[in-house]
Design a protein with these regions (language model features):
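Accessory alpha-helical/coil subdomains and C-terminal extensions
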Residues: 12-14, 20-35, 39, 55-194
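Glycine-rich, charge-decorated loop segments at or immediately adjacent to ligand/cofactor-binding or catalytic sites
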Residues: 46-54
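Residues within alpha-helical segments
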Residues: 2, 23, 103, 222-225, ...
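C-terminal non-catalytic interaction/assembly regions of soluble proteins
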Residues: 159-313
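Acidic, glycine-rich active-site loops and adjacent beta-strand->loop/helix elements
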Residues: 16-18, 43-47, 91-93, 120-122, ...
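Single conserved hydrophobic/aromatic residue that forms the stacking wall/gate
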Residues: 1-10
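Short, conserved clusters of charged catalytic residues that mark active-site
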Residues: 1, 126-127, 219
Length: 313
């Protein structure tokens, strides 16, 4: 039972499933005339929540993805061999994190050479043809691919994987897309092929967090309290983009019923016509979110974080 004696404000941080929880609790509270206020705070590296320009956590994860891609490029260029490196990145239905791989590009590096997102139908023959074209001008090909890419029938590439599992919410945990593509590429080209799955490292690399992301995360948490004190319940906090250059945002809130169980995917116009890269518009959207460095404290040569020993119980 809900009890206002325990708390007058309930704040839930998370993604789509967490916002669904906020909606259900708010509905229940209203039905029972409870005084508890329910406010949702976005927090997901997937960046797929409606009602906000982006989500806390995404900028830091995107920064890790971009930095990892750049470092993989440096490693691949050491060897005087024709090679293809496939990097599988999280994203079941939305390809925001995979798109962030493009941020690895700089004055001397154009990789990732190809980017494949779940918003676009994936065709194996075209995939191989794309690689062939890149090989005409480069020795080392680096590819970023979302774990959730689908074929023309809407099937995930790893649907038949023997390693398929489900999370606590019943969502299939996709793993194996990179390995499948690795086998496909090796069979076609016979060159050195390697697939890399960034997996959970994408969401826990605090040593390379985005300062912009952290700053906004602190503020939006404070704004959530302010919203509850305005006697508002059943809302989700969010960001409204005012400008890319210079980067400027405002803090807003949206009725949770317009957010829960919906997904914000990459607009098709932000993906190139070939379906194998992103546009400048998407790059400009992503770029500000990874800016600024987080300086962590080190102890005995490794980052010193708050103890999480209590979580082992």
């Amino acid at each position: 039972a809900l009890s206002s004696a325990a708390s007058d404000v309930y704040k839930r941080q998370g993604g789509n499933d967490s916002m669904d929880t906020v909606m259900k609790l708010d509905d229940y509270a209203k039905y029972n005339n409870s005084d508890i206020h329910f406010i949702g705070i976005p927090k997901t590296i997937d960046n797929d929540l409606m009602g906000t320009d982006h989500t806390p956590g995404f900028g830091s994860a995107a920064k890790y993805v971009a930095a990892s891609i750049l470092e993989v490029v440096h490693d691949s260029l050491i060897y005087q061999l024709q090679s293809v490196t496939i990097i599988e990145i999280m994203g079941r239905n939305a390809g925001w994190l995979t798109a962030a791989a493009a941020l690895a590009r700089n004055e001397y590096n154009v990789a990732p050479d190809l980017i494949y997102l779940p918003e676009v139908v994936f065709n194996k023959d075209k995939f191989l043809a794309d690689i062939h074209e890149v090989m005409k001008r480069k020795r080392c090909v680096v590819i970023a691919v979302s774990e959730g890419i689908r074929d023309e029938n809407g099937h995930f590439l790893d649907d038949d994987s023997k390693y398929a599992k489900k999370d606590a919410f019943g969502h299939v945990l996709h793993s194996g897309t990179g390995k499948l593509l690795e086998s496909l590429v090796f069979k076609e080209f016979g060159c050195k092929v390697r697939s890399i799955e960034l997996n959970v490292l994408q969401r826990c690399a605090m040593h390379i967090g985005s300062k912009t992301d952290l700053n906004e995360s602190f503020v939006i948490g404070s704004k959530a309290i302010d919203k509850a004190l305005e006697n508002i319940s059943g809302h989700v906090m969010g960001f409204k983009r005012l400008s890319n250059h210079p980067y400027e945002i405002d803090y807003i809130s949206t009725d949770v019923r317009e957010v829960a169980n919906y997904e914000q995917k990459i607009p098709v116009e932000w993906i190139n016509k070939e379906g194998n890269d992103i546009t400048q518009e998407l790059y400009d959207y992503l770029y500000p979110l990874i800016q600024g460095e987080v300086h962590v404290t080190y102890k005995d040569g490794i980052p010193s974080y708050y103890s999480c020993k209590h979580l082992e119980k």
